[in-house]
Each structure stands twice: as C-alpha cells, then as structure tokens.
Amino acid sequence: MSATVPEIRSENLLRYTVIGSRRPSVYFWAVALTGGGLGFTLAGLSSYFHRNLLPFSDPASLVFIPQGIAMLFYGVLGSLAGLYQWLSLYWNLGGGYNEFDRRTQKITLVRQGFPGKNREVRLEYDFAEVQSLRVELREGFNPRRAIYLRIKGRGDIPLTGVGQPPPLAEIENQAAEIARFLNVSLEGI
C-alpha cells in the first residue's frame, strides 16, 4: 500500500492524499494487542477470583502472586497499547494531504495530530520559496524512500507519509510530477 495517493490532477491543481495511521499493519497490531491484553487480563483476574473467566483454559488454578499478578499487569499494558492503536486509527494520526495550487501560487501541507487546539497541522508556502525537490533513496535493512520539499532558509519538509516505503518507480514518478508542476529542480535521482 502506498503512502501517498494522487487525488486530484489538473492543469492548475495537484493534490496528494497522505495515508497516516490507517495502514493494515496498524489494524493488525490493534487487534493483536487488544486480544492479547484482554486474554492476559482475564487470566490474571481468574487467578485472583479463583473463577474461570476464559473458556479455553483454566487460569483459576494459577497462584495469584506471582503468576496471576504478572499476567494482570501485562494484560493491562497490552490493553492500553491496543487502546492507543485504536485511538490513533480513529484520529488518523499523520494523515492529510499535499496540495500544490498554481492559481494561488501556494503549497499547502496538512496533517492530522492528536485532539486539541493544534489538531490539524497546516503549513503554507509560496511557490517562490521553493528551492528544489529532494528525493532520498536508501536501501538495506531499513529502507527509506522519501520526497522532501526544500524551502529557502527553512530546510527540508517531508512530503511522503510514514510506513512501508513505496515502490521506487512510484517515488520517482511522483517526484518528477511535482517538480514539473512547481518548475523546480529535482535532486537525488
């Protein structure tokens, strides 16, 4: 699954949707952590109350200290980690879009954050502020394929989302399309 998906392409507007936390791996970990945490919590409570709360095993025969309390502790931790994963999915952390508008000569980068006053992070730049587009390609154990917007006096701003690196051809095509649209040079390819 790609980190950015082209949404709108026209002569005057280019918009890419950035997938945040709503990736298949996050769904998998949310289910696994919630299920495991619930199982361990019920096993710990079964050993405390001496009553079987799990249909597929008999944790009521466990001694509460140290096995039951350890299982209860790990169950609560797993459940909290699962809750965090579900909330990050609900809030779509990191999701947003990159919009390049020729009419207004503006670049708008929007990302979703945690709830509160600054939930939506919105960055706006003029086309004139853009120095170039940089592509980072790093292979190996921890591969990285990313596109950065170089802004004069401000450094590099990532345009691609996190997660599984997109295919090389997709990164190259997207970077070339954005560089052509902005009429700037492309570095790193």
From Swiss-Prot:
TM annotation in the entry: 25-45, 62-82
Record has NAD as a keyword: no
Location within or outside the cell: Cellular thylakoid membrane
Entry-linked InterPro entries: PSI_Ycf4_assembly
Topological relation to the membrane, as annotated: Multi-pass membrane protein
UniProt entry keywords in alphabetical sequence: Membrane, Photosynthesis, Thylakoid, Transmembrane, Transmembrane helix
Keyword Phosphoprotein: no
GO biological process, one term: photosynthesis
This protein's GO CC annotations: photosystem I; plasma membrane-derived thylakoid membrane
UniProt family annotation: Belongs to the Ycf4 family.
Function: Seems to be required for the assembly of the photosystem I complex.
The protein, known as: Photosystem I assembly protein Ycf4
Native species: Synechococcus sp. (strain JA-3-3Ab) (Cyanobacteria bacterium Yellowstone A-Prime)
